[in-house]
Structures are given as C-alpha cells and as structure tokens.
Amino acid sequence: MVCVGIDVAKDKHDCFIISSEGEILADVFTIPNNAEGFDTLLQAIRRSTRPEDKIKVGLEATGHYSYNILGFLLDKGLPTYVINPLHTNLYRKSLSLRKTKTDRVDARTIAAMLMSDVDLKSYTDTAYH
C-alpha cells in the first residue's frame, strides 16, 4: 500500500508519499493550488507506485481550500480520506513531545494516520435530498 499525505493551504499544498513498509517514496514537496500543481502530484504518485499498489490519499478538512484538489483526486479515482484537523493534531502530539507544527510535519502526519488507522472511511460525494 502507498499512502499520500497532503497538507492543504490557500495557495499551496505540501505532499508526502510513503509505502506501508515505511519507505519514503517522495519526501515532502510543495505544489501550487491549481491544475498544474495537481498534475504534478498525480505524476509523483504514478512514479512512486506500481499498477497493483493500493493507494490511499489523505488531506485535512480545510473548508473551501481543499475543494479543488479533493475534486481532482476523486475524478482520478483515487481513494481519498478527508481527516478532521483536530484528529491530525492529536495524532501528531501522540507521536512526539515536541511542539513541532509545520506544513511539512502535517503532510507526514496525515500519511502516517492513513497507514495506522483502519477506521477511516474514504470520502464520497453524496448529496441527500
């Protein structure tokens, strides 16, 4: 399995790709919050995986800043998990006593959460009437 952690921000996203064995496939890299950046992310995922690999992509729920990348990932058929920022914060604190909070650390934390949390449910765009 390959896990992709994305820390979403207004103008840019920090991304991190790791295998379930703990091998870093792509250390933290930054993409712009636009179609070109999303294509760069998709290329990095494809370079880091084999066709038989199961892929999980996780990002924090950050309101409207995450809508475009979330839509892109879903359109590409990637299982995507939208994680409550409170859970990310608590998970990060459980891993370290340091008060380290950076976008780079968050991207790694989100990927680690995907590897360890079997209770996460992938995002579905369901409308109820």
For each feature predicted by the language model, list its residue ranges.
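Phosphate- and other anionic-substrate recognition elements at nucleic-acid/protein interfaces
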Residues: 1-129
